[in-house]
């Protein structure tokens, strides 16, 4: 029986993580979780899983939950998030929150020697050097939950990582993969939220449409696997059947395939190095699919992917700036305050405005994050 703390239980990854726990009640126990403002959902999860601690975003929601929570302790805010991450009984902390708010709980959980199931891209994007140094120092495993990084992780199992020639990350292309840049001037929020292959939260779905999601994954892969950016490629693969590939120095290529279902990489992170049945996921029958398609990525068409490579290669504080600018811009687009292509423009402005700090401390990263958010808000 593994004890799990779950940060971000009401999001897309969080709800699918609970599906996995639900499927294997003899293998996993939910000891703590956090939610944002979805209190009705929190009540249902408390009643089903009887966790010891639950954290909510707002203080005013604490009383609402206490009246129905039984013996579950209710906490709130950033301190509450830390309490969930540091639950003494938790063996695995699944970081499924959206945005840079996941950074501090991850670092503290690593220091407490918890195994980390990392679904929060922004943690490694904004502070990859700090996270990986902490993981090495405390001998903690970072197990990828993203389908692409889980695929790479599985391809590397038992391999000599010094023999890697290239990582090849696949991209579905998002909601607008077949549109020209001219057509993108007129797309709506509703258009952007219709992802062709995956069911995800609104922020990551917009990131998929801009291709920023893939850019964040490139930076994440750089840190998780220690591979230079020059050896990380992205290929457009509309079917989302091959989740990623690894090329070795003898030009052999290993790929991980499967029907698009986020519960597969989530469960693998929780069960690693073992596997468990996942009977209600669709079996992959290649003859039903027939043909798989691949295209070279056009970084002028998908400018956010180019920004991510530029930020990653610049290093230091630049990825944190790019990430903060993106979060503010995406939120403004979702609120219909800016157009779709303005997201790219705001990110570019923020990056051009910033002078890189080579090895920023945690405090500097948090300051840069806040300053970038203010800068971008002023541009809107």
Swiss-Prot record:
Q: Where does 1-deoxy-D-xylulose 5-phosphate bind?
A: 121, 147-148, 172, 195, 208, 213-214, 217
Q: What is its EC number?
A: 1.1.1.267
Any GO molecular function:
manganese ion binding
Q: Which InterPro entries match?
A: DXP_reductoisomerase (IPR003821), DXP_reductoisomerase_C (IPR013644), DXP_reductoisomerase_N (IPR013512), DXPR_C (IPR026877), DXPR_C_sf (IPR036169), NAD(P)-bd_dom_sf (IPR036291)
Ligand binding (NADPH): 10-13, 36-38, 120, 122, 201
Residues annotated as binding Mn(2+): 146, 148, 217
Q: Name one Pfam family in it.
A: DXP_redisom_C
Q: Which cofactor does it need?
A: Mg(2+); Mn(2+)
Q: Which reaction does it catalyse?
A: 2-C-methyl-D-erythritol 4-phosphate + NADP(+) = 1-deoxy-D-xylulose 5-phosphate + NADPH + H(+)
The protein's UniProt keywords, in alphabetical order, are: Isoprene biosynthesis, Manganese, Metal-binding, NADP, Oxidoreductase
Q: What are its GO biological-process terms?
A: isopentenyl diphosphate biosynthetic process, methylerythritol 4-phosphate pathway involved in terpenoid biosynthetic process
The pathway entry for this protein reads as: Isoprenoid biosynthesis; isopentenyl diphosphate biosynthesis via DXP pathway; isopentenyl diphosphate from 1-deoxy-D-xylulose 5-phosphate: step 1/6
Q: What family, per the record? A: Belongs to the DXR family.
Please explain the role this protein plays, according to its UniProt record. Answer: Catalyzes the NADPH-dependent rearrangement and reduction of 1-deoxy-D-xylulose-5-phosphate (DXP) to 2-C-methyl-D-erythritol 4-phosphate (MEP).
- Which protein, by its recorded name, is this? 1-deoxy-D-xylulose 5-phosphate reductoisomerase 2
């Amino acid at each position: 029986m593994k004890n799990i703390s779950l940060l971000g239980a009401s999001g897309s990854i969080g709800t699918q993580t609970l599906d996995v726990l639900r499927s294997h009640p003899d293998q996993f126990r939910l000891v703590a979780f956090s939610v944002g403002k979805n209190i009705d959902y929190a009540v249902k999860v408390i009643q089903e899983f009887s966790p010891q601690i639950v954290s909510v975003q707002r203080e005013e929601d604490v009383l609402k939950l206490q009246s129905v929570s039984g013996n579950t302790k209710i906490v709130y805010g950033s301190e509450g998030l830390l309490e969930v991450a540091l639950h003494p009984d938790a063996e695995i902390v699944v970081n499924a929150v959206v945005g840079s708010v996941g950074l501090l709980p991850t670092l503290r959980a690593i220091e407490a020697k918890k195994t980390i199931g990392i679904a929060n891209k922004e943690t490694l994007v904004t502070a990859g050097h700090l996270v990986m140094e902490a993981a090495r120092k405390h001998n903690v495993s970072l197990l990828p939950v993203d389908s692409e990084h889980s695929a790479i992780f599985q391809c590397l199992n038992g391999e000599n990582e010094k023999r890697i020639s290239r990582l090849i990350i696949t991209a579905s292309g998002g909601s607008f993969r077949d549109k020209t840049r001219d057509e993108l001037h007129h797309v709506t929020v509703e258009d952007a939220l219709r992802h062709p292959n995956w069911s995800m939260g609104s922020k990551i779905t917009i990131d998929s449409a801009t291709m920023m999601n893939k850019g964040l994954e490139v930076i994440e892969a750089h840190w998780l696997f220690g591979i230079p950016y020059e050896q990380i490629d992205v290929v457009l693969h509309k079917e989302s059947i091959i989740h990623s590939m690894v090329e070795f120095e003898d030009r052999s290529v290993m790929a991980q395939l499967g029907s698009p279902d986020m519960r597969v990489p989530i469960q693998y992170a929780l069960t690693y190095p073992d596997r468990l049945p996942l009977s209600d996921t669709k079996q992959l029958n290649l003859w039903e699919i027939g043909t798989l398609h691949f295209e070279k990525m056009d970084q002028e068409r998908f400018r956010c992917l180019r920004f991510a490579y530029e930020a990653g290669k610049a290093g230091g504080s630049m990825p944190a700036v790019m990430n903060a600018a993106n979060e503010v811009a995406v939120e403004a687009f979702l609120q219909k305050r800016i157009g779709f292509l303005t997201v790219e423009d705001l990110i570019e402005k923020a990056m051009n405005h910033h002078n890189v700090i080579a090895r920023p401390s945690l405090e500097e990263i948090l300051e840069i994050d806040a300053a970038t958010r203010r800068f971008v808000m002023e541009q809107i």
